[in-house]
């Protein structure tokens, strides 16, 4: 019986020593997956991933009930509903609600569109250098124009400079911006992207 306990003790001590001496630094190295650093778009996979994420962002705009509510209510398809916070009634464009900056989910479009525009800027700036197919850069141009169109139709004039210059990929957060006029948004961002 003694030799069995001795073997178990030796094996247990060896296993404990193995676990205590193993390094876990690789496990703790973080790989960011929700934001892009400047080197992300310097590879072909990075540019392709950026274009893929622009398609994925559509669910954050059109997948929300608030967006459907603002587009469908007042038609013969649907009428306003009610939610716990009352936002559905306020977003109703058939005249039942009172749409203001404090009573609607305008942040859903604002935040999603600008992050997608920044991704498109990164793809457009780096796509040719990486050597990807021009169609991927064209898709990024379309999405940038599409997002600016949604923004300008909803909010009027919106900023073209996200912090690094007009229509440039921004890597540092900016809390200030200058609102461009509606004609500027169309002539600098929407029409040129759709025509190239």
Description of each model-found segment:
Residues 167-177:
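Substrate-binding clefts and substrate-entry loops adjacent to catalytic sites
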């Amino acid at each position: 019986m003694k030799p069995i306990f001795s073997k178990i003790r030796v094996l247990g001590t060896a296993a404990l020593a193995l676990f205590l001496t193993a390094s876990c630094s690789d496990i703790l190295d973080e790989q960011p997956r929700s934001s892009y650093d400047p080197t992300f778009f310097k590879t072909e996979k990075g540019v392709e991933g950026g274009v893929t994420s622009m398609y994925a962002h559509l669910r954050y705009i059109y997948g929300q009930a608030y967006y459907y509510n603002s587009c469908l209510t007042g038609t013969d398809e649907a009428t306003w509903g009610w939610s716990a916070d009352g936002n559905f009634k306020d977003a109703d464009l058939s005249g039942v609600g009172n749409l203001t900056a404090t009573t609607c989910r305008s942040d859903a479009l604002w935040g999603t569109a600008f992050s997608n525009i920044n991704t498109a800027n990164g793809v457009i700036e780096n796509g040719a250098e990486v050597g990807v197919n021009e169609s991927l850069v064209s898709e990024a141009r379309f999405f940038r124009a599409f997002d600016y169109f949604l923004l300008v139709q909803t909010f009027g004039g919106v900023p073209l400079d996200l912090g690094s210059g007009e229509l440039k990929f921004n890597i540092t957060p900016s809390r200030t911006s200058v609102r461009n006029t509606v004609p500027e948004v169309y002539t600098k961002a929407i029409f040129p992207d759709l025509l190239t």
